[in-house]
Amino acid sequence: MNPEAMADVHTQGAFSMVELLLAADPVVKAVLIALVIASIWSWAVVTEKFFAIGGARKKAKEFEEAFWNGRADEYELRPGQSSNNAGAKLFAAISREWRDAKSVSPSEHAALVARAERSLRATVDREVGNVSNGIGALATIGSSSVYIGLFGTVWGIMNAFLNISAQEDTSLAVVGGPIAEALFATGLGLIAAIPAVIFYNKFSGDLNRYADMLDAFSQDLLVRLSRRASDGPI
């Protein structure tokens, strides 16, 4: 930062973070803008995933309850459906095997269950992948924002020493601006990184529980399918 510009800010008695950003060194300014964008991006991802993961788990649970209560026919279960209910998609993935289970011969029993298992596994992976799409940005922001802020800090401190050398003066008017820039970059880096790391860990746990729930329902479907193929209608 130009020391004269910083002095003008102080003399006007209207110092603020916005004015600090506008008067900052171009490199530090680029760092601060990048961190602001990263922070906004991370909160956008957090908001979207908060509703997406919660909604997906709720809908899958609703279908599972309907299935065990004998109301699965309330859902459209044809393969290739556009439903956003993961539970319904799991059942749709084995709907053909479910229909054929009543008439399958004993020699085809194992093959039918194996086909269903592969289809369910692929569907679970696809559904978890769809819901988790985007949370990698939180990991990137959480791991990189601190270092980006640190770069701005180093640059601001370097400018402070350069100003001391150029002005041959160690007064606050000379070093205050660059030091303020350095501290602001550090703080903004932490502001961007900390929420990103916290919510990345939270969503990772939520996704693991979501995947476990779908896996458990898949295994229940396989058991019911196997019994249906062996014993006829349940």
Question: Where are the regions a protein language model picked out?
Answer:
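Hydrophobic alpha-helical transmembrane segments of polytopic membrane proteins
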Residues: 179-198
